[in-house]
């Protein structure tokens, strides 16, 4: 059974001006160091908190790569949760589970014309290797069984429900279109992601 091992206060966001708490865990399925970032003590004060399961993306989250919209989705969620409260489950699942170096190899294939899924397949991987059991374990450690899920990804909805978490509402993020990620976003939409390109 997973438990919270530590709870640390810190300031987050692009300007480091948003108060939050970062939680670490013990007893998860693997030894990956997933964390929860909690805003406005949502785990203590909200019966159905806003939750985003955000898979680590070094290139997008840290270096603001033009290849994806991960950093923009993360920042949008931080800003939303700074006002309404919520929990980001930051999961160490780089490259939809294939790892950083393999993702960089996939980037090279994308530069040659493949889309993000074709590149992963060419390297011998499935479209999405992520499993969200540990996300469910983290929520259970916080005594949370019902959430409002921030996602555009139907796989996340299905997977977290399969692990016993009830979804009260699905909240979409914006389609953060910029030079360099249009093909990537349209590939995701073709694979079922709910993206509104009109906004």
Swiss-Prot record:
Keyword Amino-acid biosynthesis: no
Cofactor binding: number and manner: Binds 1 zinc ion per subunit.
Reactions catalysed according to its record: GTP + 4 H2O = 2,5-diamino-6-hydroxy-4-(5-phosphoribosylamino)-pyrimidine + formate + 2 phosphate + 3 H(+)
Residues binding Zn(2+), per UniProt: 57, 68, 70
Keyword Metal-binding assigned: yes
GO biological process: riboflavin biosynthetic process
EC number of the protein: 3.5.4.25
Pathway(s) it belongs to: Cofactor biosynthesis; riboflavin biosynthesis; 5-amino-6-(D-ribitylamino)uracil from GTP: step 1/4
Example GO molecular function: GTP cyclohydrolase II activity
Positions annotated as active site in the UniProt record: 128 (proton acceptor), 130 (nucleophile)
InterPro entries: GTP_cyclohydro_II, RibA, RibA-like_sf
Binding site for GTP: 52-56, 73, 94-96, 116, 151, 156
HAMAP family, alphabetized: RibA (MF_00179)
Family from the record: Belongs to the GTP cyclohydrolase II family.
Protein known as: GTP cyclohydrolase-2
Organism of this sequence: Aliivibrio fischeri (strain ATCC 700601 / ES114) (Vibrio fischeri)
């Amino acid at each position: 059974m997973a438990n919270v091992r530590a709870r640390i206060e810190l300031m987050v966001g692009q300007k480091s001006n948003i108060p939050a708490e970062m939680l670490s865990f013990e007893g998860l399925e693997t030894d990956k160091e997933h964390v929860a970032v909690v805003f406005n003590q949502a785990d203590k004060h909200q019966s159905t908190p806003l939750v985003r399961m955000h898979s680590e993306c070094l290139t997008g989250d840290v270096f603001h790569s033009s290849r994806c919209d991960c950093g923009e989705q993360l920042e949008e969620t931080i800003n939303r949760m700074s006002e309404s409260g919520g929990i980001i489950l930051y999961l160490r699942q780089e490259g939809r589970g294939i790892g950083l170096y393999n993702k960089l190899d996939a980037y090279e294939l994308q530069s040659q014309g493949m889309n993000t899924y074709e590149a992963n397949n060419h390297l011998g991987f499935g479209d999405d290797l992520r499993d969200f059991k540990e996300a469910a374990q983290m929520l259970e450690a916080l005594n949370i069984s019902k959430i409002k899920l921030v996602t555009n990804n139907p796989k996340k909805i299905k997977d977290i429900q399969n692990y016993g978490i009830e979804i009260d509402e699905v909240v979409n993020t914006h389609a953060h279109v910029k030079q360099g990620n249009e093909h990537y976003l349209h590939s995701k939409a073709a694979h079922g992601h709910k993206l509104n390109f009109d906004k």
